[in-house]
Amino acid sequence: NQKMEVSTVQTHLHTADYLQLEDQYGAHNYHPIPVVLARGKGAELWDVEGKHYFDFLSAYSAVNQGHCHPRITEALVEQAQKLTLTSRAFYNDQLGPYEKFVTEYFGYDKVLPMNTGVEAVETALKLCRKWGYQKKGIEQGRAKIIFASGNFHGRTLAVISASVDPAARNDFGPYMPGYVVVPYNDVEALAAQIKDPDVAGVIIEPIQGEAGVFVPDEGYLADVKKLCTQNNVLFIADEVQTGIARTGKLLATCGNCTCAGHCENKYETRADILILGKALSGGVVPVSAVLADDEIMMCLKPGEHGSTFGGNPLACAVAKTALEVVRDEQLSERAEELGKVFRERMQQLIAQSPLVTLVRGKGLLNAIVINDEEDSHTAWDICVALMQNGLLAKPTHGNIIRFAPPLVITIEQLEICCNIITETILNFKKS
C-alpha cells in the first residue's frame, strides 16, 4: 500500500514540486530554465503540465535527429531485449560491425569507442601524448598540447586545466601540466608556439559553441592543419558539439565536402584525431568516439586505455542507426538550408531591435548577442520570456543566446519559432 501511495503522489506532482525536489536532493551545479519536461517528439517538447514548446537547444546539440526518433528508439528497444553490456573482456556481435561502419562513414582506419564527450577528449589527449613519445620522439614527461583560449572540452580536471573560464577553473587546482593556451582564430600566435619540438598536438573546436558560437575566419582551420603538418604535430578536432550534421556539413572540419555520410576525401582540414559524441546516439544513450588512422591509433596497446561501457552492444546498435538517420534524412543539407533562413530572420530582427547586436553561426548552430554587459541577466530574462511563449533556449556567457534546434525541424516550424523569437524580443522590457 505504501508503494502505491508514493506512486499516486508522484503522478500528481506539478512544476514547482519537481523544482523543489531537485533543489532539496540534487547538487546545485546547474541553473536550469524553470520548466520540467516530460515528453518529446522531433523538435517539440511538452512539460508536466502539458504545455507545448519548441526545442531550440537540442540538449547542447545531442538531439540532432530529433527527440525519440522512431528508428533510433526501435534499435534501442530491439537491442536492449537481447544484450546490453559485456565489457571489453569479451567480444560482442555489435561492436565489430559498428566499428567498420563508423570508420568508413568518417573515413578513418580505426575507432576507439567511449561514452561521454569529455571521456573522448581525454582519450584523444592520452593518444596524442602516446604518439608524441612513441612516434615523434619527445622526451618522456615533456609532451605539450596546445589549446585555444575560450575552449570548452568538458569538466574533468584534465581539460579544465586548459580552460580560461573562471567558473570552470577556479578552486579546482592544481592543474594538469603540459598545456599551452593560445588565442582562438589567431594563426600567428599558434605558429609561434607550435615550433616547440615538445608539442605533440593542437586541439581545436571548429566552432566554439559554449563560448558563444564563435565562428573562426575562413581558412583558419586549414592554416591550423597546415602548421600541424609542417611541424609534425597532430591536429585534434573536438567535434562533440559541431559534428554529425549540426553545422550544415557532416563535420564542421569538412570544408566543402558533400559526402553525406561516407567520407572518402582526405580534405585539407581533416583532423589527425577526430572526437565525436552527443548526437552520435541521437541523444538516446551516452556514446562518444575517437577516430584516427593506424599510425596514431596503434600506439595504444591492451591495458593502456579502456572503458567498461565503451563499445557496449546497446550503444553500438543505437549509434549505427543514429548515423544512418543522418545520412538517409540528409540532415547536413537540411541544417545548411534552414540555417540560412534562420540567420536571415535574425538579421531582420537586428534591424528592428537595438537589443540584438549580432547573429552568428553555421548550419543550425547559431547565437544572437544581446546588447548588454556579459554579467547582466538580460539574456536569461529573455530566455524565460521565450519559455513562456513556447520556445526553449539557454544563454551562454551572460549576454549570448544559443539557438540550436533539432535538425529535423520543418521550415514551417522554424518560421513559427523565428516569429516567437522576434515577438518576444520586440516586446521585451529590461527589468
Descriptions of predicted regions:
Residues 5-431:
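Conserved N-terminal phosphate-binding loop of PLP-dependent enzymes in the Aspartate aminotransferase
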